[in-house]
Amino acid sequence: LGDYCRYSSSLEPLLSEFAICLIARIWGSGYEWKVHSKIAIDAGVNEDMIESISLGKKPSHMSDEQHAVYEFTMTLNRDRKISDELYNKTYEILGKDRIVDLVGILGYYTLISMTISISISTVPRVTCSPRMALQAIPIHPKKDICTFFPSKADCVI
């Protein structure tokens, strides 16, 4: 499933990585953010958009396709459903195959974010300002697991 989502999806990398960054931000997954924000930029996502996502803000100057991915992703995660109106708007822009692949990508990377949060359950939980999402560092020397490493001024422990 992961290989399909990353390499064979009908969504071009610019859109799939944009969606993955949204999921990483929604879940506060430092590892996913660190890896996929860089891949997204390499795939053509504007750095200002990545910065906006990291701050929990809606990016400006999105293409119609990026806007469709953003609205679909944020609505599905917030409301746990998509209205007929939003589905139809998204369908007009992305089409059925890309909507199906978008839902698969969102589900898969939500699973990854959940798994990572369980994997680091022995690490004290820290709640930080959104800007800190950009500062993920390794926390386990033998595993590729990262967490946020903010300053004390930005955190509640």
Show where each model-derived region lies.
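Hydrophobic alpha-helical segments
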Residues: 1-157
